[in-house]
Amino acid sequence: MAFISVDPNALLKALPYTGDGVAYGSGGNAVTGVGFQPDFTWIKSATTSEEHVITDSVRGVTKTIKPNSTAAEYTSSEGLNVFGADGFTVGSSDQFNTNTETYASWSFKGGTTSGIATNGSTTITPSAYSFNQSAGFSII
């Protein structure tokens, strides 16, 4: 049996950061040290009861969902605004970047957006997706 070696640090990074309250239009708060460009980031304040927030590259930056809420997806120009080569940049929204507040973030590396093979009878064609077969992680 062949074993596949997967480095979990290349696929998932938990990273605490401190908010600075800077609005995205003024540069925002660049959180670096992830080690890869994230495709999915989950953020939660570690110091207040703010809701959890998730942003992903398929839905698009500024599109946010709250997994611990019944609220629908919403758009925030002051939420997560950029997935960069080594992290992400957030604006001044309370759930992402209140000055001096501590946040926990979990960033996941997605994968490619091409190469989905079908058997010819597939009736669903996603408009956007990201999948990483070796990590067993997909965003559809």
Language-model features: locations:
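Surface-exposed molecular-recognition determinants
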Residues: 1-140
